[in-house]
Amino acid sequence: AQFLANRGYAVLQPNFRGSTGFGRKHLQSSFKQWGQAMQDDITDGIRHLVAQGIVDPQRVCIGGGSYGGYATLMGLVKDPKQYRCGISVVGVSDLIWMQELGYSDFNSYRPDAADAFFAITMGDLKADRAMLEQYSPRRHADKVQAPVLFVHGADDKRVPIKHAEGMRDALKAAGKPFDWLVFSGEGHGFLKPENRLEYFRRMEAFLRQHNPP
């Protein structure tokens, strides 16, 4: 946020439902709301800033990491006219994959606990499968209108790189623009200083190209 503010951008970091530190009710209000009410919280925040005269509604980009990467992709699918570009960092692209990919560290150590957690917070693979498909960005890539920058660690064990590759391939098949940045030897986040610097350089260049301050 400080980097983007330093480059002249207004930055919104909403505590959408499910954010920690706001009590049980706030947390539970996010259950089975990926791409739904959780996504609407972000959209409502943008509309509030627009109403306050802080943000030009025609010059908004969305970006984030992990769940924020998912929210980026889902925002581009759900509100394609709202955003000029998106930056998905180690983001989830398919809610079914998130549960079925056995090589994610989230569900490989204690599969039974992971299954129960996902069934409560994201949706049950059987009972809620149609909902999970509906709110998986990879399955609706044709709705995306804005260019996307993907940033991922090749060795990500939390959100395997297949999520980025799957969304990239779906965008390519739909004729949609994207940029691609993968760091070898990195996981669910970037630890090497040279990689962090390159990430910031690419993010700044991408934003200046598609949504200059």
Residue spans for each PLM region:
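Active-site-proximal cap/loop segments of hydrolase catalytic domains
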Residues: 1-7, 13-213
